[in-house]
Amino acid sequence: MGKFQVISHPLIQHKLSILRREDTSTKDFRELVNEIAMLMGYEVSRDLPLEEVEIQTPIIKTVQKQLSGKKLAIVPILRAGIGMVDGFLSLVPAAKVGHIGMYRDEETLEPVEYLVKLPEDIDQRQIFVMDPMLATGGSAILAVDSLKKRGAANIKFVCLVAAPEGVKKLQDAHPDIDIYTASLDERLNENGYIVPGLGDAGDRLFGTK
């Protein structure tokens, strides 16, 4: 079973409280999502492998540690997931970025995939799927399904807020993946929104309705 972790660092929790506020501007919302994603990246990347390397300091030659060169991929779920990419990418600039686009069918209310653009060697990469919200779990499950169909096996799901219903649904569908969030909220309301949540992350990121 993959792990589920709430990253409760004080800086993350402080910024998340501002992010939730109804009066937070689009500009500030965008910057906060970027900052929280970067801070979460510290914990999400904790198990990246290291290797020893000999370097020359101004004083002496020494053996130190660096990332082993394991291939990474950041895969945001469009469109809101885009807001998390740059923050995480600033920590691992060599990572490739793929995209999975979805829309919600108005009749079935289920997510429908309309775009998949991934690195050719996605099956060889450690993948970080990003979406600010894990609500019903439908989009997350479809995204992981899509990645696994293409041979991906090492997948982590990273979100800012999650509903218990969505976490359970994703764990039931894909018990092997790790899930990271900055907050496990109370529940979903009758419209499928996370409570207390932060509203529609895509609209708030891009200033749309």
From Swiss-Prot:
GO terms for biological process: UMP salvage; uracil salvage. InterPro entries: PRibTrfase_dom, PRTase-like, Upp_B, UPRTase/APRTase, Ura_phspho_trans. It is an enzyme of class 2 (transferase). Gene3D superfamilies: 3.40.50.2020. The keyword Glycosyltransferase applies. It catalyses: UMP + diphosphate = 5-phospho-alpha-D-ribose 1-diphosphate + uracil. Pfam families: UPRTase. Uracil binds at residues 194, 199-201. It comes from the Bacteria. Its cofactor is Mg(2+). 5-phospho-alpha-D-ribose 1-diphosphate binds at residues 79, 104, 131-139, 200. Catalyzes the conversion of uracil and 5-phospho-alpha-D-ribose 1-diphosphate (PRPP) to UMP and diphosphate. This is Uracil phosphoribosyltransferase.
